[in-house]
Amino acid sequence: MIKTYNGSKLGIASSHRKALLRNLAAALFLYEKITTTLSKAKELVSYSEKLVTKAKKADLSAMRAINGEINSKAAVKKIFDILVPRYKERSGGYTQILKVGTRRGDSADVAIVKLVT
């Protein structure tokens, strides 16, 4: 029986994929808007939504969990100081994907991922 997997493998090793998502999430939380390929954007949205939902608990275990996931101290500080109060009343849908077009060099679909204000 063929088993379906949750999420895309992105054609890279699991450790590389995990590092990629952590770095993209840190950049998204710091700058609130980043440009990447469409497949990476879709994976990033699912990953970052889970992090924000976990951070909304705002207890010590949530802080430690987020700190373990994201290596940037500035991004973690921004999550708890700015983003959690912003999304306090919102139950999901913190990010948005906007398709931009294709990249000239390799014709990859490009998208902008941004945090909803």
Swiss-Prot record:
List, alphabetically, the Gene3D superfamilies matched: Ribosomal protein L17
| InterPro entries in the cross-refs | Ribosomal_bL17, Ribosomal_bL17_CS, Ribosomal_bL17_sf
Q: SUPFAM superfamilies annotated for this entry?
A: Prokaryotic ribosomal protein L17 (SSF64263)
Q: Which UniProt keywords apply?
A: Ribonucleoprotein, Ribosomal protein
Write out the GO cellular component annotations: cytosolic large ribosomal subunit
The GO annotation for biological process reads: translation
Q: Which GO terms describe its molecular function?
A: structural constituent of ribosome
The record ties this protein, via Pfam families, to: Ribosomal_L17
Q: Which family does it belong to?
A: Belongs to the bacterial ribosomal protein bL17 family.
Q: Which HAMAP family match?
A: Ribosomal_bL17
Subunit structure comment from the entry: Part of the 50S ribosomal subunit. Contacts protein L32.
| Name of the protein in question | Large ribosomal subunit protein bL17
Q: State the species of origin.
A: Endomicrobium trichonymphae
